[in-house]
Design a protein with these regions (language model features):
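Amphipathic alpha-helical packing elements
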Residues: 49-53
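Glycine- and acidic-residue-biased ligand/ion/polar-headgroup-sensing regions
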Residues: 55, 66-86
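Short acidic-glycine-tyrosine-enriched beta hairpin
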Residues: 70, 84-114
Length: 159
């Protein structure tokens, strides 16, 4: 389970020390992921997170039905992978931080099954989702492995 850091400030400034703390939490986490929830409540109409991911983490393909989503790479590089309903890869996009020669921002209006795989030792992304947060009742398709080792194998093959 990713390490979750909750914000309690109405006005939040992100500084280099905070970024390093989030990255350190990711390094210590068994999931190799840590996220700062920038919003105050799951009920907020906009959900924003600063997420640190170490190489080797496994983010299961997911989608947010009926909600828009955007993501900006702040540091490092990822492979964004999109899947069709049957688990076939339909698109791969290498993304990097601004100033790289890669795409650094995406926005989905209708969210497909997707995941990201870190291509560098550490990745920091800023994700924005339409709120409020509602835990999906959608059953993940059979092509998404529940076993962590099988999930990593799927992601390595897809990347």
């Amino acid at each position: 389970m990713p390490e979750v850091i909750k914000n309690s400030e109405n006005l939040l400034f992100i500084n280099p020390e905070m970024v390093e703390n989030i990255k350190e939490e990711a390094r210590k986490s068994s999931s190799l992921i840590a996220r700062l929830l920038m919003h105050l409540s799951h009920e907020d109409p906009v959900q924003e997170m600063l997420i640190a991911m170490c190489r080797g983490c496994a983010v299961a393909p997911n989608r947010a039905l009926g909600r828009s989503e955007s993501l900006q790479v702040v540091e490092g590089e990822i492979m964004l992978i999109m899947f069709d309903e049957n688990g076939e890869v339909i698109q791969r996009v290498e993304m990097g931080s601004p100033g790289s020669d890669k795409a650094f921002l995406y926005r989905f209006t209708s969210t497909p099954w997707h995941t990201m795989v870190p291509l560098t030792e550490m990745v920091m992304v800023h994700e924005t989702l339409q709120g409020p947060f509602v835990q999906s009742s959608e059953t993940p398709p059979e092509w998404i492995p529940q076993d962590p080792t099988e999930l990593k194998n799927l992601l390595n093959q897809a990347a």
